[in-house]
Amino acid sequence: MRIIFLLIFLACAGLIGYALYLQLMDGLLPCPLCIFQRIAYWLIGITALFTFIHNPQSLGQHIYYGLIILFSLAGAIVAGRQAWLIRFPEAFECGISPEEAFLNGLPLAQWWPNMFEANGDCNDGTWQFLSLTLPDWSLLIFAAFGIIAGLLWHKKYNSINQ
């Protein structure tokens, strides 16, 4: 079961790496919602790596599974919001948002601006693969991570109660 968490960590690292590739090589600038999703991928990936390395017992597993579910849910909510904004651009407000000002003011944005500085347009849906935009794919991936952690948690809970 530990290998699943290594795979989740590697998937998160690959997704973050691909986001940086799109930003630096293709010029697709991240918006505030993209940065929040990157942070969620970081949190999921680090939690999965800790789970893999630590190999916790019962209580620790519940905590790690719960954190992955929480971070996946947060990422899915943000990705869903961005997917909605792309489909309904008239609901989008132009100008610097409070989220952008908040994110760009964080020490992380000063320390690693390529990763954490938001300067893109949230309703830019130009990148597509199989007719799905980046936030659509991100929503599916966050859902998958949450479902995997939920199933593992359920399996662990059932094995304890039997």
UniProtKB/Swiss-Prot annotation:
Positions of transmembrane segments: 5-21, 40-56, 63-80, 137-155
Membrane topology, Periplasmic segments: 22-39, 81-136
Keyword check for Magnesium: no
Keyword check for Metal-binding: no
Location(s) in or outside the cell: Cell inner membrane
Pfam families for this protein: DsbB (PF02600)
Disulfide-bond pairs as recorded: C31-C34, C94-C122
InterPro entries given in the database record: DiS_bond_form_DsbB/BdbC (IPR003752), Disulphide_bond_form_DsbB (IPR022920), DsbB (IPR050183), DsbB-like_sf (IPR023380)
Superkingdom of this protein's organism: Bacteria
Keyword line: Cell inner membrane, Cell membrane, Chaperone, Disulfide bond, Electron transport, Membrane, Oxidoreductase, Redox-active center, Transmembrane, Transmembrane helix, Transport
A GO molecular-function annotation: electron transfer activity
Cited Gene3D superfamilies: DsbB-like
GO biological process: protein folding
Example of a GO cellular component annotation carried by this entry: plasma membrane
Residue spans, topological domain Cytoplasmic: 1-4, 57-62, 156-162
Membrane topology: Multi-pass membrane protein
HAMAP family: DsbB
Role summary: Required for disulfide bond formation in some periplasmic proteins. Acts by oxidizing the DsbA protein.
Family: Belongs to the DsbB family.
UniProt protein name: Disulfide bond formation protein B
